[in-house]
Structure formats: C-alpha cells, structure tokens
From Swiss-Prot:
Binding site for Cu(2+): 22, 69, 135
GO molecular function, one term: metal ion binding
Residues modified by glycosylation: 52, 89, 115, 124, 149, 160
Highest taxon above the source species: Eukaryota
Source species: Laccaria bicolor (strain S238N-H82 / ATCC MYA-4686) (Bicoloured deceiver)
Propeptide span(s): 180-206
Function in brief: Lytic polysaccharide monooxygenase-like protein that has diverged to biological functions other than polysaccharide degradation since it does not perform oxidative cleavage of polysaccharides. Involved in fungal-cell-wall remodeling during Laccaria-Populus symbiosis. Acts as a cell surface-bound protein that functions in the copper-accumulation pathway. May also act as the major cell wall sensor that regulates MAP kinase-dependent hyphal anastomosis, the fusion of hyphal cells.
Identification of the protein by name: Lytic polysaccharide monooxygenase-like protein X325
Keywords associated with the record: Cell membrane, Cell wall, Copper, Disulfide bond, Glycoprotein, GPI-anchor, Lipoprotein, Membrane, Metal-binding, Secreted, Signal
Entry cofactors: Cu(2+)
Subcellular localization, as worded in the UniProt entry: Cell membrane; Secreted, Cell wall
C-alpha cells in the first residue's frame, strides 16, 4: 500500500522518538545529572555515591519521575552498603508494576510497607529505580539518609500527568543482574500502580 511521504516521515519520527525515550528521576535527587546514553547501565553510569545524600522519611515518602513512555514497568531495588558499586549490592524491595502514561508521576514510596528490614533512623542507603518502557531496562540511583521525623518539603510537588493510568502488579523478579525480567499479572485498575508497587493508595497524596 502506498504511503504518502509526509505520513511516512511523521511515522518514522514517532518510531525514532519511541526508541530513544527514557525516564528521569526527579525526587529524591538522582546520584548525578541525567545521561541518556548511560541510563541502560548501573546507576545511569554513576559508580560512586553522591557527596550530598537526600534526607528521606522512613514512612510516608514518595518518588517523582518523568516518563517518556506511554507504557512502562518499574520497580525499586535497595542497598544498605555504604558504597554499592554493582547490581549484586542491591535487593528488590517492591513488586514490579506496569503503568500507562507519559509525563510527571508521583509514586508513594513508604519504606515501612516494603519488604526491606532493619532500616533505622540516620542510616545511609541507596535506592535504584528500574524502568522499562519496552526498549530495555533503564536505571537511576538516589543516595539517601533515612529519617523517622523528616517530612518532605511542600515545595516538592506530588502530582500526576494522568489519573486514568491502569496498572498490573507483578511478582518478584531477579535482581542480581542488569537483565532482570519485568513480567506482568492481572490489572488492578485506576491508580493500581502505586498500591501494588509502593504500598499505599494514590488518594493519600493527591
């Protein structure tokens, strides 16, 4: 079937944009400046912890990110090592979940609702956010100091680009290598991603 040049050009541009799409962790602050070419590697290419860690609450926290994919799967790994330098230093602490939507997303992240154990006030940890929009796993890390009394500043906005996102919860995935699989299971419905992945309802932060 004949394809008009204009339509073909637009279709090609859309395809290229999809292939090059990524995500950017907004809060907590990532380990270093976003480097698109390095995001498929450990901690977006940053092997060493940040000099200035982000204070983060043991309960009632959230994560904000910008998604450039219309359909994506995500999960969180955590390391309690003082200087985590490889995937082997991290353990999966949330199920993987799938969501629809591009733009800014606020994902409630209550550490007390994850399977992480032994976390304490004042402890230094690192989280690694795993994101897959269909073109392979992408990674960004954030180095944190945990606090039982800290409240995230109201200047850090917790809002979502879409409230019509659907989600699927997934079981545990392997975390020992960069090629950990991101599977799916039946859908939860509106705002299901934050309940399935991070342990509390989206309604508590909107």
């Amino acid at each position: 079937m004949y394809c008009q040049p204009k339509f073909f050009t637009l279709a090609l541009l859309a395809l290229v944009a999809g292939v090059n799409a990524h995500f950017q962790l907004q809060f907590p602050s990532p380990r270093g400046a976003f480097v698109e070419d390095n995001e498929p590697t450990f901690c977006d290419g940053y092997a060493n912890p940040a000099a200035n860690r982000t204070e983060f609450p043991l309960t009632g926290g959230f994560i904000t990110l910008n998604s450039e994919h219309p359909l994506w799967t995500s999960g969180i790994l955590l390391s309690t090592a003082s200087d985590p330098t490889s995937f082997n230093n991290f353990s999966q602490i949330t199920p993987y979940a799938q969501a629809h939507g591009e733009g800014l997303f606020c994902l409630p992240f209550d550490l007390s609702a994850t399977n992480a154990t032994g976390l304490q006030d004042g402890q230094n940890v690192t989280i690694q956010f795993v994101f897959n929009g269909g073109d392979g796993n992408l990674y960004q890390c954030a180095d944190l100091t945990l606090s039982k009394n800290f409240t995230i500043s109201s200047s850090i906005t917790c809002s979502n680009a879409s409230v019509s996102a659907t989600a699927t919860s997934t079981g545990a995935a392997a975390t020992g290598s960069k090629s950990a699989a991101l599977g799916t299971v039946p859908a939860f419905g509106v705002a299901g991603i934050v309940t399935a992945l991070f342990g509390i309802s989206l309604a508590t932060v909107m």
